């Protein structure tokens, strides 16, 4: 019973029958111009701690932006808390990990019968926009301006120089 060893996934689903969006795990969506997300309860706190640690390490001259991009020792500092938080999978937040998902932890967004443009996405887009092109541009701007993700947008991970993002990305846009 070690959740940190389990494969986990997030999922966002549109139910045509129920006219609902179901959010399991950390994902996000746009319904028209309305933004919805479903972050893990302590994700922002962990991101803030990582950002503070990165700023401290750089202020003390122990690390640089470049060195942190290669080996993120600020992330290393929060790994124990991230692992500890995994004990709460499908208790305080929902994920797909092979165990029962508590229905009350699935975020449900009901839709009326108006026509809607819907965007469903993973949390790999720090700034979700109404088109994939705009979302990718915002991601590229984030990478250029703050590759460590410790400024305006804070994350538990930085961009890695050999990868094109800091997290998984999925995006779909459709109309109902």
Where in this protein do the model-derived segments appear?
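Surface-exposed beta-loop interaction hotspot
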Residues: 30-85
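Serine/threonine-rich low-complexity intrinsically disordered regions
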Residues: 15, 41-42, 64, 71-72, ...
């Amino acid at each position: 019973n070690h959740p940190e060893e389990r494969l986990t996934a997030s999922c966002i689903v549109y139910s045509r029958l129920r006219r609902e969006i179901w959010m399991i795990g950390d994902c996000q969506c746009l319904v028209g111009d309305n933004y919805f997300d479903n972050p893990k309860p302590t994700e922002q706190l962990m991101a803030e701690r990582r950002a503070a640690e990165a700023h401290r390490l750089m202020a003390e001259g122990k690390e640089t932006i470049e060195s942190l991009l290669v080996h993120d020792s600020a992330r290393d500092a929060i790994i124990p808390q991230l692992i500890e938080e995994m004990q709460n999978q499908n208790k305080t937040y929902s994920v797909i990990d092979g165990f029962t998902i508590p229905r009350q932890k699935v975020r449900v967004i009901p839709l009326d019968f108006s026509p809607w443009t819907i965007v469903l996405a993973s949390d790999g887009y720090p700034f979700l926009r109404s088109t994939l092109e705009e979302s990718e541009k915002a991601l590229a701007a984030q990478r250029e301006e703050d590759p460590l993700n410790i400024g305006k947008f804070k994350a538990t991970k930085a961009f890695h120089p050999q990868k094109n993002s800091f997290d998984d990305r999925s995006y779909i846009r459709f109309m109902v």
